[in-house]
UniProtKB/Swiss-Prot annotation:
It comes from Methanosarcina acetivorans (strain ATCC 35395 / DSM 2834 / JCM 12185 / C2A). Substrate binds at R81, R87, N119, R150. It catalyses: (S)-malate + NAD(+) = oxaloacetate + NADH + H(+). Its EC number is 1.1.1.37. This is Malate dehydrogenase.
Length: 307
């Protein structure tokens, strides 16, 4: 049985713990700097187990020592972007938070696999890797599974079909410069361009790129957490079960797509060792151009942090 630690007991972190607990993967630790928050949510989740029928031990804590010997650590800590806050402000604030988190992971869970969910995702995942000193394959970010899920949901709505029959593909940076790939997106094996006209696909791609912002606008306060937590658990299961799933992942590049030394959303094989292989797809020229712009944005972010 595995030991899993989730750093951050906000909506994303707590919902992730709930989904994981229902799968009974082993012991789960949820930690947060706010006293009482992880303890209260852990107690609530333990009581839910008596109703939903799971026996997972969930522990809430403010002490990083409790993550000792974790097999998997999921980082959901940090702040969300607030009105008037620039992306650079968000990056600097969250890099400090995740720097502290990562130092504690290195101290107490030096053999763990680390999944980062904190934004700006690709830059912060780089911060986590550099600060822990872990191998690049053992630290990666969750973004593409969420983005692909949003794309698939919009396609299903447009076609009035089951989401179960859609395999959507999104790569690139997590944010405005993500790259949904219609040519690699299928509905029961049928390429999307054979089912929808170009202008409709373009509209769905644009909605996917703005998918997180759409939810923020509707909520007025806070951001998405149901779909993000579902995506996190999908990625976590690939590691815990060593299933070798091929999923969109923010992985460290070593020459793929002409990029090196940054984290970037690509297709990757995930297993017990983390990122076990990065797969490179043939893209259209305009998609390569968006990838280049996205990579430059990530590189500028890393440079500004002076890492």
């Amino acid at each position: 049985m595995a030991k899993i630690s989730v750093i951050g007991a906000g909506n994303v972190g707590a919902t992730t713990v709930q989904r994981l607990a229902e799968l009974e993967p082993g012991e789960i630790v949820m930690t947060d700097i706010v006293e009482g928050l992880p303890q209260g949510k852990a107690l609530d989740l333990m009581q839910a187990g008596a109703i939903n029928g799971y026996d997972t031990q969930v522990t809430g804590t403010n002490d990083y020592a409790d993550i000792t010997d974790s097999d998997l650590v999921i980082i959901t800590a940090g702040i969300a972007r607030k009105p008037g806050m620039t992306r650079e402000d968000l990056m600097k604030t969250n890099s400090k938070i995740i720097g502290e988190v990562s130092r504690n992971i290195a101290e107490y869970a030096p053999n763990s696999i680390v999944i980062n969910v904190t934004n700006p995702l690709d830059v912060i995942t780089y911060v986590a890797m550099k600060t822990t000193g872990f191998e690049t394959k053992k630290v990666f970010g969750m973004s593409g599974v969420l983005d692909a899920g949003r794309f698939a949901s919009f396609i299903a709505e447009e076609l009035n079909c089951s989401k179960k029959d859609i395999e959507a593909m999104v790569i690139g940076g997590h944010g405005d410069l993500m790259v949904p790939l219609p040519q690699y997106t299928t509905v029961s094996g049928i390429p999307l361009p054979e089912l929808l006209p170009e202008e409709t696909i373009a509209r769905l791609v644009e909605r996917t790129v703005n998918g997180g912002a759409e939810i923020v606008g509707l909520l007025k306060q806070g951001s998405a957490f149901y779909a993000p937590s579902a995506a996190i658990v999908s990625v976590a299961e690939a590691v815990l079960k060593d299933s070798k799933r091929i999923l969109p992942t923010s992985a460290y590049l070593e020459g793929q797509y002409g990029q090196e030394g940054i984290y970037f959303g690509v297709l990757a094989k995930l297993g017990a060792n983390g990122v076990e292989e990065v797969l490179e797809l043939k893209l259209e020229e305009n998609q390569y151009e968006i990838l280049r712009k996205s990579s430059e944005t990530i590189k500028r972010g890393i440079s500004k942090l002076g890492i």
